[in-house]
A protein has these predicted regions:
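Conserved class I S-adenosyl-L-methionine
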Residues: 23-34, 48-49
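S-adenosyl-L-methionine
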Residues: 1-23, 144
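Class I S-adenosyl-L-methionine-dependent methyltransferase module
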Residues: 56-210
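Conserved beta-strand signature within the Rossmann-like core of class I S-adenosyl-L-methionine
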Residues: 239, 265-277
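C-terminal region signature
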Residues: 17-18, 272-296
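A short acidic, Gly/Pro-enriched loop at the edge of an enzyme's catalytic core
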Residues: 24, 222-239
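Conserved acidic E/D residue at the C-terminus of a beta-strand in Rossmann-like folds
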Residues: 50-55
C-alpha cells in the first residue's frame, strides 16, 4: 500500500488513522524532528526505528527525549516561549515565526482571536471570509512562501535536486482549508503558524507528562536508501518523509524498488509530495495500491 500527502509537517492525526487501519510488524521513519515518532509511540506503536544521515537531527531527538523526562520540560521545549526551546530550533520553525510576527498587519482587526474562538466549521467559514480575505495577506504570503524562499529554508539535502516538476502548492489556500477543517485548538501546526508558538494548543506527546520508554525508539545514523536495502522481508511501515523531493528521479526509482523488495503484502510506504511531483515507477504501481485519502 502506498500513500503520499501534501503537508509541510507531519499530520499525526492522519498517521494514527493509517497505522490503526494498516498495522505493520516493523516501523521505520526518517528521523526529522522526532515529533511524529513521539506521537505514534504515545498512540501505541511499540517500536520505531528513526533513521537519518544527519547526526545533528538524531542529537536533537535525543535532547527531546531527555527533556520529556525533565521536571522543567515546558521550559526546555519552549512551550510558552516564542524565542527559546527545542520546539523552535528548526529552520522551518524560525521562518514561520517571522511570518507570524507580521501576520497581524496583513489581517483585519481581531482576525486571529476570532478564528481561535470558532467551534463550528460554519463559524470558521464566516470569519475567514470576513477577516482573513485581504489583498495584503494574498500578496505577502505569495512572496513569503514563494518556491525560491521555501527551497532556501529547507535543509540543503532536501533541495539539492530541483529538476522535477514543481507541484504548484498554494500555501495560503492549504492554510485556509486546514483552518476550516479543524478548530485551531485541535491543530497545533496551524496555531504555530498564526502565533509563532503553540499558544492555544499542544502537541499530543507533550500532554500529561508523557515520556517514551527507552526501548520504544532506536536512532540510526545512516542514509535511508542503504537502510531500507538491508531490511528483512516483512510487513513494514516505511515513512520516507520528503527526502525524495531533494533527490533525482533515478534515485527515487531505486528507493521505490528497494521498498518493494523488502515489503510483504499489507506493507505501507509513505512519502511527501509537497514541493515537487514524485514520479512513481509503473512497475511499482502494478504491485501497490494507492490509499484514497478521502476515505482515511
Amino acid at each position: 500500500m502506498i500513500l503520499h500527502y501534501a503537508q509541510s509537517w507531519e499530520d499525526t492525526h492522519l498517521l494514527k488513522q493509517i497505522i490503526g487501519k494498516h498495522p505493520a510488524q516493523y516501523h521505520h521513519m526518517i528521523a526529522s524532528g522526532g515529533d511524529h515518532a513521539f506521537s505514534l509511540v504515545k498512540f501505541g506503536v511499540e517500536h520505531i526505528n528513526l533513521v537519518d544521515s544527519e547526526v545533528i537531527q538524531l542529537e536533537h531527538i535525543q535532547s527531546k527525549i531527555k527533556a520529556l523526562e525533565h521536571p522543567k520540560r515546558e521550559i526546555l521545549f519552549g512551550i510558552n516561549d516564542v524565542n527559546n526551546g527545542l520546539l523552535h530550533s528548526g529552520r522551518l520553525e524560525k521562518y514561520l515565526r517571522k511570518f507570524s510576527a507580521i501576520l497581524p498587519l496583513l489581517l483585519r482587526p481581531g482576525a486571529r482571536n476570532s478564528i481561535i474562538d470558532c467551534i463550528s466549521k460554519e463559524e470558521r467559514v464566516r470569519i475567514i471570509k470576513e477577516k482573513w480575505e485581504t489583498k495584503r495577506l494574498r500578496l505577502v504570503s505569495s512572496l513569503f512562501f514563494s518556491k525560491k524562499n521555501i527551497n532556501d529554508i529547507r535543509h540543503p539535502g532536501l533541495s539539492s535536486d530541483i529538476s522535477k516538476s514543481p507541484s504548484g502548492v498554494n500555501y495560503l489556500e492549504n492554510f485556509k482549508l486546514k483552518a476550516l477543517q479543524y478548530p485551531i485548538k485541535e491543530n497545533p501546526y496551524l496555531d504555530y503558524i498564526i502565533h509563532g508558538y503553540h499558544k492555544n494548543s499542544s502537541l499530543d506527546y507533550l500532554k500529561k507528562s508523557w515520556a517514551p520508554k527507552t526501548s520504544s525508539l532506536t536512532l540510526i545514523h545512516q542514509d535511508f536508501f542503504s537502510y531500507v536495502k538491508k531490511l528483512k522481508t516483512a510487513i513494514h511501515f516505511i515513512h520516507a518523509s520528503d527526502i525524495m523531493e531533494g533527490t533525482s528521479s533515478k534515485f527515487n526509482d531505486r528507493l521505490f524498488q528497494a521498498v518493494d523488495e523488502v515489503s510483504e503484502s499489507n506493507s505501507t510506504f509513505l512519502y511527501w509530495e509537497h514541493r515537487y511531483e514524485i514520479n512513481v515507477p509503473e512497475s511499482f504501481k502494478k504491485k501497490w495500491v494507492q490509499i484514497n485519502m478521502n476515505v482515511i
